[in-house]
Regions:
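Gly/Ser/Thr-rich loops at beta-strand to alpha-helix junctions
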Residues: 15, 83-88, 117-119, 171-174, ...
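Short, amphipathic alpha-helical "recognition" segments used to contact nucleic acids or chromatin
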Residues: 270-286, 300
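DNA major-groove recognition helix of helix-turn-helix
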Residues: 295, 306
Length: 313
């Protein structure tokens, strides 16, 4: 019997026009299509003549096992997921099931991961450009992750001034997690920090709410919602949520380079310039603790500069 194949397909936010050509081709080639029932509905028009296996919530490992069994019998399987199947999706669990069953890459069943536009990208596109600078995503689902781990990640992201995308913010049974997330974020962020609450991006019941961090938990939020929380520079203007890339740190609005900066070179407070600045402050009698407070950094970062030999450039 010939070996089968498993396509792990991310088909994007749901609208057909946002599905990649490769995702369509993989579904078309498949003998069997497996997915959460809601995902099956979103691609129903592509499934004529195929064996379709619908699964419910909490049956993720069953989907992986079924995909493996069908592929073992020589069939081509498309295990589908909305968004990107490698981002909070089925790619990881599938590989775990395969490896636990003795499968190894290059032997037997072929596996191909097909990426798709994930929820944070889709939601960001609908509200402007909130992800133009450093960002992170955190799932508030504690079904598989202990809350202390989630809280620690929220704390770190808030302190580091990341734009934060919250996945799985709330469900019928999980209503307190978004409130706790808001509390943690408010320890480091202004109550006026812009927030976008996007439900069912690019689907029939799409809704968008622009609000502030202080009101975030009061918004209509559910399992199909992604929440985007700005950093200290994010702003909303004319209905657009925008996070500056940082050009204002180096350039005037005229396009001219600011005094002390050079086009195409690190900022004056880039890594080298920052270390020079730290050494200057130390030579002026400032203590490591004072310098750490000035830059809002752990004192160990200042001590690391003190322990280095100055670079000669």
């Amino acid at each position: 019997m010939s070996n089968g194949k498993i396509y792990l397909v991310g088909f994007g936010p749901g609208a057909q026009e946002h599905m990649s050509y490769r995702a369509r081709a993989a579904i078309a080639e498949a003998d069997v299509v497996i997915g959460y029932s809601t995902y099956i509905k979103l691609v129903q028009e592509l499934l004529d003549g195929k064996q379709v296996i619908k699964k419910g919530m909490t049956e993720e490992l069953d989907r992986c096992t079924e995909a493996y069994e069908h592929a073992r019998h020589g069939r081509i399987v498309a295990l589908i997921s909305s968004g990107d199947i490698g981002v909070y999706g089925m790619a990881g669990p599938t590989y775990e099931v395969l490896l636990a069953s003795g499968w190894r890459p290059g032997t037997g069943i072929e596996v191909e991961v097909i990426p798709g536009a994930t929820a944070l990208s889709a939601c960001a596109a609908l509200v402007g450009a909130p992800l133009t600078h450093d960002f992170c995503s955190i799932s508030l689902s504690d079904l598989l992750t202990p809350w202390p781990v989630i809280a620690r990640r929220l704390e770190a992201a808030a302190y580091a001034d990341f734009v934060v995308a919250l996945y799985n913010p709330k469900s019928g049974r999980r209503t307190g997690q978004i409130v706790e997330a808001q509390r943690i974020l408010l320890q480091h962020r202004s109550p006026d920090t812009p927030v976008a609450v996007v439900k069912s991006a690019y689907r029939r019941k799409q809704s968008i709410q622009l609000t502030r961090l202080a009101q975030m938990a009061d918004c209509e939020i559910g399992m199909l919602t992604t929440v985007l929380i700005g950093n200290s520079n994010t702003f909303v203007q004319d209905g657009l949520m925008i996070t500056p890339r940082g050009y204002a740190n180096k350039y005037q609005v005229t396009g001219e380079v600011k005094d002390g900066e050079q086009a195409g070179r690190s900022l004056s407070l880039g890594l080298h310039g920052w270390k020079v600045n730290v050494r200057e402050r130390l030579s002026q009698g400032q203590t490591p603790d004072e310098i750490a407070r000035h830059f809002d950094l752990p004192v160990i970062e200042i001590e690391s500069v003190m322990n280095e030999e100055p670079a000669h450039v």
